[in-house]
């Protein structure tokens, strides 16, 4: 106790498992800091996210078209080859071609198609995620099941916190991602309100939770990312011991954050593609297993990684800076509240 305030030793988001600092936990500040960080990141990097979403949905749509043409060809139409060729010419192949297509057909504003639900989704996503993550970390490192302060490796608490935050956040935020995918890939909606009403009318409340099952698999993304991040930081700290006593530079943190995101992105990207496909209005698949079979049958293993380039280009920079953005807002809000 210090002046009536309770302080506990809690691992900082960017500290290795050996390092702890005294932190006064404030759920409101954590929620607001995560919200502001999510909005800032979304505004800066949404164009790449839009390109990525269009490529992911295009992958499943192309797979369906190819399957239907194959059926027609087997039925004796004889036009399968030429039609298949026309499909490949009509659809942009790759992130650069997709970006050019968006700019040519929709102008610069096309890169921000569907941005409204994404801003709201990011605000809720990171606000909820970081507040739950920090709250779980606070609880985990305050006591164990016997009421004693936890003294084990910090990565265990990080893992439990990441899984807990990921599951709860996914369940809450999924409707925003459904709206984002619909607005980013379809021109039939005049805005977020129209899309919301249309989905509710034609698909019911359940339509907003399309793809939520596969989204839960994505909880592993945060787990892979954070464990990798902690490990890389620890290795760099050990290598810096002889030079500067183990102090880590800003570059060290950015490298660790970017590399950890790269590892997590490569391992979990297929689920992102399947989730986007299931949430798309034109998706012909009724389940995750059906989507996996359809994509694999048409494009093989590489089909599960279509669009991974813009995904990594979009996600690595904000991942490398996100923790610092959160720390900045957290420190600013803490100082302002005192």
Swiss-Prot record:
Q: Which InterPro entries match?
A: Mitochondrial_sb/sol_carrier (IPR018108), Mt_carrier_dom_sf (IPR023395), SLC25A32-like (IPR044712)
> Which compartments does it reside in?
Mitochondrion inner membrane
Q: Repeats (Solcar): which ranges?
A: 25-139, 153-235, 248-332
Main subcellular location of this protein, as a coarse class: mitochondrion
The cellular component terms of Gene Ontology attached to this UniProt record, alphabetical and capped at eight, are:
mitochondrial inner membrane; mitochondrion
| Intervals, Mitochondrial intermembrane compartment | 1-24, 131-158, 225-253, 329-338
Keyword Signal on entry: no
Q: Which GO terms describe its molecular function?
A: FAD transmembrane transporter activity; folic acid transmembrane transporter activity
Q: Where are the transmembrane segments?
A: 25-45, 110-130, 159-179, 204-224, 254-274, 308-328
Q: Looking at the Swiss-Prot or TrEMBL record, what is one Pfam family this protein matches?
A: Mito_carr
One GO BP annotation here? transmembrane transport
Q: What is its induction behaviour?
A: Regulated by the MADS-box transcription factor srfA during development.
Q: Which UniProt keywords apply?
A: Membrane, Mitochondrion, Mitochondrion inner membrane, Repeat, Transmembrane, Transmembrane helix, Transport
- What topology does it adopt in the membrane? Multi-pass membrane protein
User: Which residues face the membrane's Mitochondrial matrix side?
Assistant: 46-109, 180-203, 275-307
Which superkingdom is the protein from? Eukaryota
Please give the family membership noted in the entry. Belongs to the mitochondrial carrier (TC 2.A.29) family.
Any idea what job this protein has?
Answer: Mitochondrial solute carriers shuttle metabolites, nucleotides, and cofactors through the mitochondrial inner membrane. Transports folate across the inner membranes of mitochondria.
Q: Which PANTHER family match?
A: MITOCHONDRIAL NICOTINAMIDE ADENINE DINUCLEOTIDE TRANSPORTER 1-RELATED-RELATED
Q: What is this protein called?
A: Mitochondrial substrate carrier family protein I
Q: Which organism is it from?
A: Dictyostelium discoideum (Social amoeba)
């Amino acid at each position: 106790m210090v002046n009536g305030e309770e302080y506990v030793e809690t691992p900082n988001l960017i500290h290795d498992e050996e390092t702890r600092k005294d932190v006064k936990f404030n759920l409101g500040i954590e929620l607001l800091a995560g919200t502001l960080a999510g909005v800032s990141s979304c505004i800066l990097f949404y164009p790449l996210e839009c390109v990525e979403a269009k490529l992911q949905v295009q992958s499943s749509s192309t797979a369906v078209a190819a399957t239907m043409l194959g059926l027609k060809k087997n039925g004796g139409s004889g036009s399968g080859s030429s039609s298949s060729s026309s499909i490949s010419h009509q659809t942009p192949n790759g992130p650069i071609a997709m970006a050019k297509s968006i700019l040519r057909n929709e102008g610069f504003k096309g890169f921000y198609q569907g941005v409204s639900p994404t801003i709201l989704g990011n605000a809720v996503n990171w606000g909820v995620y970081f507040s739950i993550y920090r709250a779980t970390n606070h609880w985990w490192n305050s006591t164990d099941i016997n009421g004693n302060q936890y003294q084990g490796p910090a990565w265990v608490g990080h893992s439990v916190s990441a899984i807990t935050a990921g599951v709860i956040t996914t369940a809450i935020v999924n409707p925003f991602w459904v709206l984002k995918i619909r607005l980013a890939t379809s021109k039939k909606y005049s805005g977020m309100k129209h899309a919301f009403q249309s989905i509710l009318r034609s698909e019911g409340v359940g339509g907003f939770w399309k793809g939520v099952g596969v989204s839960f698999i994505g909880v592993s993304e945060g787990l892979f990312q954070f464990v990798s991040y902690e490990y890389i930081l620890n290795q760099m700290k050990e290598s810096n011991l002889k030079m500067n006593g183990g102090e880590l530079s800003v570059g060290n943190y950015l490298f660790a954050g970017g590399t950890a995101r790269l590892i997590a992105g490569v391992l979990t990207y297929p689920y992102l593609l399947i989730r986007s496909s299931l949430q798309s209005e034109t998706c012909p698949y009724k389940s995750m297993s059906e989507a996996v079979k359809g994509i694999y049958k048409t494009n093989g293993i590489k089909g599960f990684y279509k669009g991974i380039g813009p995904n990594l280009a979009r996600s690595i920079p904000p991942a490398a800076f996100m923790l610092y953005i959160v720390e900045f807002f957290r420190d600013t809000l803490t100082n302002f509240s005192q």
